[in-house]
Regions:
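Conserved Rossmann-fold NAD(P)-dependent oxidoreductase catalytic core, especially the SDR/UDP-sugar
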Residues: 92, 96-141
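Mid/C-terminal beta-alpha module of Rossmann-like enzyme folds, strongest
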Residues: 216-282, 300, 316-321
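NAD(P)H-binding glycine-rich loop region in Rossmannoid oxidoreductase-like domains
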Residues: 37-43, 47-92, 100
């Protein structure tokens, strides 16, 4: 029997799959649940639900009690929004969980990070490794908040006492991915154009590969370290999105716009939304374009050497599984 762990974000895309995989490997799994619907969801996945919130340190202390490991998967992810909300959820919420976990004598704290924490402006980034510094951009509140959160997590490492590790995937995909429904709607409405023809190289990470890396980080990760992980074989933006759309029987778009033009359009849309207090998200933002509009691939050599990481699901296998479900 493996250790007892706490999972945050257990009702979400990655969290629910992580719960299923951990249970199949013999873990005792608790899952933080901030609502009754979340309680039902994580219980349905097989975990023991614990009511609490990242805003409530007392509830986190109860949730982490007698746990050996914390998997911090929860995050506030949007491509547009109030920076204060990203700060509250992704930075202060993580600080609260770190405090509770350390106080409960948790041995390992593994955070699901984001490859985007090293993204700068629009320049291509190929074969990126962990030597690159964290980046913060005012127009990218999600990745900036994840960068601050990661720095805090790794800074909390105490060798042999409270060891912290961060796993950094690029775009996570797989069955029930929450962004695919929105992508289908946008394509059906004729609102999606490729940027620079969709030819930009990109790394991706199937949800099972991410969960595998999170578990390996507990067993083999060095405290105070971050690890890039991916599917191993890179693709282009057009190949990735076309493959996902085709699992729903949707033909990909054919039109394209240059990145330089799209960047100006995104700036204009952000200005309109900000000045006129428009509701919802702009159709295009600079953060969105940075995530998908320029080449970005990862060197996963460190994870391979130190964690023994190998992708467990290939791109083709993952697409076939999505097609079948």
């Amino acid at each position: 029997m493996k250790s007892t762990c706490l999972v945050t974000g257990g009702s979400g895309f990655v969290g629910r799959r992580l719960i299923q995989i951990l249970l199949s490997h013999g873990w005792q799994v608790r899952a933080l649940a901030r609502s009754e619907s979340a309680v039902r969801a994580v219980r349905g996945h097989g975990a023991e639900p614990v009511r609490g919130s990242l805003d409530d340190v007392a509830s986190l202390e109860v949730a982490a009690r007698d746990c050996d490991v914390v998997f911090h998967v929860a995050a506030y992810f949007k491509l547009w929004g109030d920076p204060a909300e990203f700060e509250r959820s992704n930075v202060q919420g993580t600080a609260n969980l770190l405090r509770a976990a350390a106080g409960a004598s948790v041995k390992r704290f593994v955070q699901l990070g984001a490859a985007a924490v090293v993204m700068g402006d629009r320049a291509p980034m190929l074969g990126v490794n962990e030597a690159l510094p964290l980046q913060e951009r005012a127009w990218a509140p999600y990745s900036s908040s994840k960068a601050r959160s990661e720095a805090m997590v790794l800074g909390a490492n105490r060798p042999g006492i409270f060891e912290t590790v961060v796993v950094r995937p690029p775009m996570i995909w797989g069955p029930n991915m929450p962004t695919l429904d929105h992508l289908v709607e946008v394509v059906k409405a004729g609102q999606l154009r490729w940027v620079d023809g969709g030819s930009q190289a990109m790394s991706t990470a199937h949800v099972d590969n991410v969960c595998n890396a999170l578990e390996l980080a507990v067993e083999k990760g060095r405290g105070g370290e971050a690890y890039f992980v991916s599917d191993g074989a890179d693709s282009t933006l057009k190949e990735v999105l076309s493959g996902l759309l085709q699992t729903r029987g949707i033909e990909p778009p054919r039109t394209s716009a240059p990145l330089s033009v799209a960047w100006v359009m995104a700036c204009a849309m952000e200005w309109i939304w900000r000045v006129f207090s428009r509701q919802g998200e702009p159709p295009m933002t600079r953060q969105m374009l940075r995530l998908i509009g320029a080449p970005f691939t990862l060197d996963i050599g460190k994870a391979q050497r130190e964690l023994g990481y190998r992708p467990v699901v290939s791109r083709q296998q993952g697409l076939e599984l999505m097609q079948a479900t």
